[in-house]
Amino acid sequence: MARYRCCRSQSRSRCCRPRRRCRRRRRRSCRARRRATRCCRRRYRLRSRRY
């Protein structure tokens, strides 16, 4: 769940895509975020009700 969420403060689109603003949370997830784009979208689809 929090795996691909390196940029918590940013919007989901920014969180999924590799951005420079993701400095605070620099984990493996941040690096894997490039591939996580699909995963992120997929996960947010299930939570689309919230957003």
Curated annotation (Swiss-Prot):
<keyword id="KW-0744">Spermatogenesis</keyword>
<keyword id="KW-0539">Nucleus</keyword>
<keyword id="KW-0217">Developmental protein</keyword>
<dbReference type="GO" id="GO:0000786">
    <property type="term" value="C:nucleosome"/>
</dbReference>
<keyword id="KW-0158">Chromosome</keyword>
<protein>
    <recommendedName>
        <fullName>Sperm protamine P1</fullName>
    </recommendedName>
</protein>
<dbReference type="InterPro" id="IPR000221">
    <property type="entry name" value="Protamine_P1"/>
</dbReference>
<dbReference type="GO" id="GO:0035092">
    <property type="term" value="P:sperm DNA condensation"/>
</dbReference>
<keyword id="KW-0221">Differentiation</keyword>
<comment type="function">
    <text>Protamines substitute for histones in the chromatin of sperm during the haploid phase of spermatogenesis. They compact sperm DNA into a highly condensed, stable and inactive complex.</text>
</comment>
<keyword id="KW-0544">Nucleosome core</keyword>
<comment type="similarity">
    <text>Belongs to the protamine P1 family.</text>
</comment>
<dbReference type="GO" id="GO:0030261">
    <property type="term" value="P:chromosome condensation"/>
</dbReference>
<dbReference type="GO" id="GO:0003677">
    <property type="term" value="F:DNA binding"/>
</dbReference>
<dbReference type="GO" id="GO:0005634">
    <property type="term" value="C:nucleus"/>
</dbReference>
<keyword id="KW-0238">DNA-binding</keyword>
<dbReference type="Pfam" id="PF00260">
    <property type="entry name" value="Protamine_P1"/>
</dbReference>
<keyword id="KW-0226">DNA condensation</keyword>
